[in-house]
Amino acid sequence: MKTLLDVYSDYGSIISFSSEAGNMLAKNVISQVPLIWKTNVSTSHNIVGSLAFIDDSTYVCPVDSFYIQVEYAPIGTLFTLEIYSDLLDPPSYSYSVTTTAETEVLTLMADYQTIGYFWKLVITPPSSSYVKIGRVMVGQAWQPNIGPSGDVTVSKNPFIKSER
């Protein structure tokens, strides 16, 4: 069974679900992803999220893909996906891809067996510019007979307005 969490990158962000399982309604995102990241040379920007089932936060599911729709990023912008069991520990999995065009769709694939409570998307432009992300989608997979079958939520660390 697979759930695709669709995180729209604007100030009215919601998460919508596309899954083999029914009755999964859209949930409001706690902290919206800023539409544009203003950058300095070699400045990295992080989007950090947690993976948990609403009705049982102790059940951990594997992340198998991130789909990122890049509206604009300088050629050579590095996107890195990191999966964590604990944000204080080194990532249990890391995968990077570099943009080859200013507008493109990126798919960051994780090992299907990678288990984590947290994910981090690190965006590193090659020069002083900005990055505009149109959509971020998170692919999760889990065994249908293990763990709960309820809603899935993603919570993100809050952004301070001055940092946007």
Please report, for each region that a protein language model flagged, where it lies by residue.
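Residue-level recognition of well-ordered beta-strand positions that form the cores
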Residues: 67-69, 82, 122-124
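Flexible, glycine/threonine- and acidic-rich loop/arm segments that mediate assembly and lattice contacts
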Residues: 72, 88-90, 94-96
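Disordered, acidic Ser/Thr/Pro-rich linker "stalks" and the adjacent N-terminal cap
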Residues: 1-56, 147-163
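Extended, low-complexity, turn-rich repeat/linker tracts enriched in Gly/Pro/Ser/Thr and Asp/Glu
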Residues: 70-78, 127
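A short beta-strand element within beta-rich, extracytoplasmic domains
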Residues: 61-73
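Beta-sandwich interaction modules
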Residues: 50-62, 93-135
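Exposed low-complexity, polar/acidic, P/S/T/G-rich flexible segments that act as propeptides
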Residues: 63, 125-162
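Short, surface-exposed beta-strand/strand-loop-strand elements in extracellular ectodomains
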Residues: 75-87
